Amino acid sequence: MDSNTVSSFQVDCFLWHVRKRFADQKLGDAPFLDRLRRDQKSLRGRASTLGLDIETATRAGKQIVERILEEESNEALKMTIASVPASRYLTDMTLEEMSRDWFMLMPKQKVAGSLCIRMDQAIMEKSIILKANFSVIFDRLETLILLRAFTEEGAIVGEISPLHSLPGHTDEDVKNAVGVLIGGLEWNGNTVRVSENLQRFAWRSRNENERPSLPPKQKREVAGTIRSEV
């Protein structure tokens, strides 16, 4: 096993521990708590893949971080912070909407890269809106936290979420996943809209109805594949 992989995991475990202590003191805001929960699942998946104990890794990570801080000057720390581009966190959903449990009468699921697409194919002829919480950097979608499809009544009928065992996705990955979800929902006669944030960052082109248009390749494929894909 590569030593950098192990040490990276150890440092991530310790930094998560520090953030958890911060949250336990009721100091974290909603985006902070969202990332904390997401990263916890990711660390558990990585621990299983690497065959490492999280508690032991956390202690080792603490030693690594302490050694770095001992060598770091205040001036170097200021320069490092200033050189890191800041990302923005955009929220369409409340914490309650993100954490709410939901179930499907006719569940369908598709894994697309590191994203999992789920929808309830029992939902027909409804007006649906897609909402998402995600970060943006350099005016591009950086990381999708969670996307959910809601009916006008507030019921959750679809979802796109990162697979924590396969970290990493691009804005194009999200765009394609949204296209698959929209195609699956529309197949059953539903009308789908997306939030303004998604229109701006997940789709660059729109049709005359102000709904994101599918990429040409997906327009050809959705009708023939969505029933088996989603």
From Swiss-Prot:
A motif (Nuclear export signal) lies at residues 137-146. The lineage of its organism: Viruses, Riboviria, Orthornavirae, Negarnaviricota, Polyploviricotina. SUPFAM superfamilies: Ns1 effector domain-like, S15/NS1 RNA-binding domain. One of its GO terms (cellular component) is host cell nucleus. It comes from the Viruses. The gene is NS. It holds the Pfam family Flu_NS1. It comes from Influenza A virus (strain A/Swine/Iowa/15/1930 H1N1). Upon interferon induction, ISGylated via host HERC5; this results in the impairment of NS1 interaction with RNA targets due to its inability to form homodimers and to interact with host EIF2AK2/PKR. This is Non-structural protein 1. Residues 180-215 are annotated as: CPSF4-binding.
